[in-house]
């Protein structure tokens, strides 16, 4: 690409969501309510898992990390979106844009790896119940968590450094956050290296974890079908239903947007799809896990009863 129109960009302008000005206050209240719901819902899961000893198991260890990731993932974009909806100049500093991109990639990738760990945990619990505590040892759980955090950190740093070396011809981003693909379209510099890394790392970070999840559940189904029973089928749905719902929500939108892009995709359509996995999915996850999970509902009742006894004393 030519660099004749290259300018020094100190800030970017985020065009935000395609909302009619007359409806801006209504959508602001809606998004604020969704963000508060996301924060409170995920915090509730984290607190319940910490307070209730019955939930001190590998599955809920991964779930608490997933809730923390959802909380942070939503917080990367939502506060700035809400601020810009009330601002006449919806801008973000250059350094702030790169920082937002880094944490967006970090927590988005972390969720992908945590979903894999949770799928493996369900696979071991159903297919090897007698050896579950031996296989899912504290050492293995800790190793899976550390590996997830380290790999996502490396991936986010790599893309951020590659983006920081680029020069930009314009500073108007047709999005509500600093999306990597939107930033590349504004670059004057050669972006071939960035695009190659996105293609390769996209396969490693998204496709491989997704295939591992599918493989885990394929083996679970295969194991159940070998000894078909109503109890076995109910066990699969009760223990895996919530996780499969979250996997479908997350990967359905991400793969549809980034790995299966359509030439007919408009900016508005891409923005709406991005809202699905950055705002809607983190908000729905606590409801999916709490409403369909007897352990979580039981933990909530025990904590409430414990507080009532404390206050009565």
Curated annotation (Swiss-Prot):
This is Olfactory receptor-like protein DTMT. It comes from the Eukaryota. Putative odorant or sperm cell receptor. GO terms for molecular function: G protein-coupled receptor activity; olfactory receptor activity. The chain crosses the membrane at residues 26-49, 58-79, 101-120, 140-158, 196-218, 236-259, 272-291. Belongs to the G-protein coupled receptor 1 family. It is a multi-pass membrane protein.
């Amino acid at each position: 690409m030519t660099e004749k129109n290259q300018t020094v960009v100190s800030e970017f302008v985020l065009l935000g969501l395609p909302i009619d000005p007359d409806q801006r206050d209504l959508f602001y209240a809606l998004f604020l309510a969704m963000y508060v719901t996301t924060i409170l819902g995920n915090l509730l899961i984290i607190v319940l898992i910490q307070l209730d000893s019955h939930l001190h198991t590998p599955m809920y260890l991964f779930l608490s990390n997933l809730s923390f990731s959802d909380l942070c993932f939503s917080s990367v974009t939502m506060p700035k979106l809400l601020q810009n909806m009330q601002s006449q100049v919806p801008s973000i500093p250059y350094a702030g844009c790169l920082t937002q991109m880094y944490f967006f990639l970090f927590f988005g990738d972390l969720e992908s790896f945590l979903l894999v760990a949770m799928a493996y945990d369900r696979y071991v619990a159903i297919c090897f119940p007698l050896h579950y505590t031996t296989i899912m040892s504290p050492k293995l759980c800790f190793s899976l968590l550390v590996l997830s955090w380290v790999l996502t950190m490396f991936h986010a740093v790599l893309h951020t450094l590659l983006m920081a070396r680029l020069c930009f011809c314009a500073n108007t981003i047709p999005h509500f956050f600093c999306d990597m693909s939107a930033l590349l379209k504004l670059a004057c510099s050669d972006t071939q290296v960035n695009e190659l890394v996105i293609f390769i790392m996209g396969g490693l970070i998204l496709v491989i974890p997704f295939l591992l999840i599918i493989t885990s559940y394929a083996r679970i189904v295969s194991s159940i079908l070998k000894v078909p029973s109503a109890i076995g089928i109910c066990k699969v749905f009760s223990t895996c239903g919530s996780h499969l719902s979250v996997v479908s929500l997350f990967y359905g939108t991400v793969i549809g947007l980034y790995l299966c892009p359509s030439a007919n995709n408009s900016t508005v359509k891409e923005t709406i799809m991005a809202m699905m996995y950055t705002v809607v999915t983190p908000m729905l996850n606590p409801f999916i896990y709490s409403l369909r999970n007897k352990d979580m509902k039981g933990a909530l009742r025990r904590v409430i009863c414990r507080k009532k006894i404390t206050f009565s004393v």
